[in-house]
Design a protein with these regions (language model features):
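Glycine-rich phosphate/pyrophosphate-binding loop and the adjoining helix
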Residues: 133, 137-211
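Short, charged N-terminal beta->alpha structural module
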Residues: 12-47
Length: 211
């Protein structure tokens, strides 16, 4: 399975943007978890973090080297228009584009549709689509913010998130990062996505989300 060729060439990201569409507690939590993990791995390895940029206010004259979108699987036309406006701000074709999709546990098909639209939007602009993760947790995952990251409830999502962390740190697609790191890239979806589902039965998971 091939992704955009540039995404298979590692690149140290000097600047990065994190964009949540729409703004919600769940998407904010997922981006927080990603950024926290990136920072933790940077501390452990003694490497520097990419500088955060806000696309709508960045006046430094340089586009972001990488961008991570956090979106819902029910991305409507208005939200997709906001995504495309953000992509138009990137300018250069060297930008690596990643995505975190919050999806319904029962209907992962919608996530496939959203990912397909996002990838097409990147390809139309010549941007490097680098895949991402689909968090099949439904709504309410922000309730796990204070749960152990590798505990029973968060572990499947944390393991998927760590694959995204590795790709962002390498500045390449998740698939290529997995191959470079000796991991298994065979379980990736056709769009370079990692799907993560709860490790507990649905009734227990749903009860946990109501707390």
């Amino acid at each position: 399975m091939e992704v955009t060729a540039r995404g298979d060439v590692p690149k140290t990201l000097q600047t990065i943007a994190f964009v949540s569409i729409p703004e919600s507690a769940d998407l904010e939590f997922l981006l927080w978890d990603l950024q926290d993990a990136i920072a933790a791995y940077a501390r452990l390895s003694g490497t520097s973090l990419p500088r955060l940029v806000a696309l709508e206010t960045d006046d430094g004259g340089s586009a972001a080297d990488g961008i991570v979108f956090a979106v819902e699987d029910a991305l409507n036309n208005e939200a997709m228009s906001v995504v495309e406006q953000a992509l138009d701000c990137l300018g250069g074709t060297e930008t690596r584009v990643y995505v975190v999709v919050q999806a319904d546990c029962e209907s992962p098909e919608r996530a496939h549709t959203v990912v397909g639209h996002l990838r097409e939007a990147c390809e139309r602009r010549g941007l490097s689509w680098c895949g991402g993760i689909v968090v099949c947790a439904g709504s309410g995952i922000a309730a796990l913010r204070h749960s152990p990251r590798m505990g029973l409830l968060r572990r499947p999502f944390s393991e998927a998130m760590d694959k995204l962390v590795g790709a962002v740190r390498m500045g390449c697609s998740i698939e290529h990062a997995q191959r470079l790191g000796g991991g298994n890239a065979e379980n990736l979806g056709t769009d370079g996505m990692v799907f993560a589902e709860p490790a507990v039965p649905a009734p227990i998971w749903n009860l946990s989300m109501r707390k």
